[in-house]
Amino acid sequence: MYNIFSAFAKASLPLAGAFNKKLKLGAQGRERTWNILDKKVKSSLPKIWVHAASLGEFEQVVPVLERINRKNYQVILTFFSPSGYENKKNSPLADVVCYLPLDAVSNVNKFIATVEPSLAIMVKYEFWPNYLNALRETDCKTILVSGVFRDKMSFNSWYGKWMTHSLESFDHFFLQNESSLQNLKKLGFTNASVSGDTRFDRASQLIERDSSIAELKSFIGNKKCLVIGSSWKEDIAIMKNWLNNNDQNKNYKIIIAPHEVAPSSIKQLCDSLDYHPIKWSSLQGCVINDLESASTLIIDSIGLLTKVYSYADLAYVGGAMGTKGLHNILEAATYGVPVIIGKNYEKFPEAGKLEDLGGLFSVKDALEFESMTNQLLEDDYLRDKTGMICGHWINSNTGATREIVNYLKTIDEKLILD
C-alpha cells in the first residue's frame, strides 16, 4: 500500500504544483535532482549522504557537518522541503545539494546506485522506509542525529507498525531526550543514547562571532528593543494593538523578522499596522533622523535573524500562535534574553523545559502578550534574571556534537577534522 501511494505521489506531484507554490518549487527542484547528481557526484571519493527535511533540521546537523573532513569524503546534502533547499542550495558545508527524490522504489534504487553512500546521516525524525531498507541492503552505516521519538508517532499505531522494521537500518540513534530513548526501547531498539540536541552547540557558537550591525545600533539608540523573530500573521495579530500604541508613544524599538520575506508577505505585514515601519531593504536611502525616530524596523531579507537577536532585550519567537510550528528559541536564548512564544508548543520539548526553568513565557492572546511584554521590558531585575536563566540553559546543554563526532571517529578516523 505504501509503495502504491509513493508511486502515485511521484506521478501527481507536478500536477499538484500547479495549485501550490511550495509544491511547485519542490516538483521543479526534484526534476533537476538527477542532473545535479550526475554532474557533481564523484566516483573517486567515499560518500556521506546527509538528509534534513527542512531548514530547521539542517541547523541541527550543521555542527556535525562542520567537523567532516571533505578532503577524504564527498558530502551529498538532500532536503525534502523548499524551505531547506532554496535557502541552502549553495551551502559551503556540502559538495552536492539537491532535493531528495520521493520515496518511490524506482527513485530509491536510482538514488542509492548514483550516490553509493558509505555513511548516511538522518536528522530528527526522517524515516523514509524504502530509503532506509535500501541503506541496510547496501551495508551503509546509518545514524540518526538529534532524534525524537514521541508516544503518538506512527510507529505506535496499527497503521504504522510495519514501518518499525525500517528502523533496523540505523546503526545508532543519537536522541534529544530521555523520553525518546524510552519510546524507542518500547519499539525494541537499544542501540541508542541521549546525546542531546545539536542545536545547543550551534546556538552557543553564535555568541562567539561578530554580530554587530551598525544600522541596528543606530536604529535602537539607547532604548530597549523587542525582537520579533520568525513571525507569522497569527503572531502579528495578537501584538498589533501593542505595536500601534508603541509607535505613538515611542517607548521601545521593535525589530520584526518575519518568516516569509516575499514582497507580498512584507506588504501584508506592513498593511496590518496603522503606521509605516521602515524596511531593512530601504535603509540605504534612509537618513539618520528617520532611523532614530522610527519605532519599527522590518527585516525583509533572510540570513540576519541570528545577528538581530544579539540586539534584543526581549525576544518573541513566532510560529506557535498558529499551526506552523514553533521556530528556534535557542537562537534567541543564547544571548541571555527572555523569550515569549505563542500557545501551541506541545511538540517542542525544549520550550516546555525552558518555561519550567522560568526563562520562557507562553501567551495565548493579545491581553497576555501585552501584559507579559510590558512586564519584562519595564522590570529590569525580572528581565535580567529570566535572561540569565536562558543563557545558562544553553551553556549547560551543549556536548551533543562531541558525542556524535566521537562515534564517527570509530567508523573512520579520517572522517573527522582535527
Residue ranges and their predicted role:
Residues 14, 18-209, 227, 231-233, ...:
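Active-site and donor-binding regions of nucleotide-sugar-utilizing enzymes
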Residues 43-49, 217-226, 236, 251-253:
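Charged active-site motifs of nucleotide-sugar-dependent glycosyltransferases
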Residues 63, 67, 72-73, 78-80, ...:
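Donor-nucleotide binding loops and adjacent catalytic segments primarily
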Residues 95-101, 142-146, 191-197, 251-256, ...:
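Short hydrophobic/aromatic-enriched beta-strand-loop microsegments
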Residues 107, 131, 162, 265, ...:
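Short acidic active-site motifs
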Residues 107-114, 286-294, 302-313, 334:
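Short acidic alpha-helix that forms the nucleotide-activated donor recognition element
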Residues 170, 186-187, 305, 310-384, ...:
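Catalytic binding pocket for nucleotide-activated donors in carbohydrate/polymer assembly enzymes
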Residues 397-418:
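C-terminal alpha-helical cap of glycosyltransferases
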